[in-house]
Amino acid sequence: MRRLLSLLILLIVLIFPLFAGRVRSASTVCAIHVDVEQKMLTLFCGSEIAARYPIATGARDTPTPLGVFRINRRFSGEMGGFGTCFLGLNVPWGDYGIHGTNRPESIGTNASHGCIRMRVADAEALYARVPNGTV
């Protein structure tokens, strides 16, 4: 009985770090940084860079808004030119967001009406990782 109890305690001690790591990563706060000059979106989770994606930003006459905004709405499904997902931003003076594009050749340029364009696969990957409220 004593040996069984010792083995059970050892098993718990060995397995616990696996579950603790999952809990820690699930509660890590993520944030998005958009560099409009470099045309790059960086996802930070905690203090680590979790992903970097090339983007397209607003054209000269319709620039991407600058500031700190939160994701406040999410849509998924086929959306024509917007790809398959949309992350809406709480920009007070307009309807802007992060979304895919059916014009992947525009990535790396100033081509949108102010939104942040991504390759469809990149937008889907980001959509899966960030909830409403993400800055």
Model segments located where?
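Bacterial N-terminal signal peptides
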Residues: 8-17
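Membrane-interface motif at the C-terminal end of an N-terminal transmembrane signal
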Residues: 16-24
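A structural motif detector for short, solvent-exposed N-terminal "entry" segments of globular domains
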Residues: 25-60
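Exported/periplasmic cell-wall-interacting domains
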Residues: 23-31, 59-68, 73-135
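Positively charged n-region of N-terminal signal peptides that target proteins for export
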Residues: 1-4
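Compositionally biased, low-complexity intrinsically disordered regions
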Residues: 7-8, 27
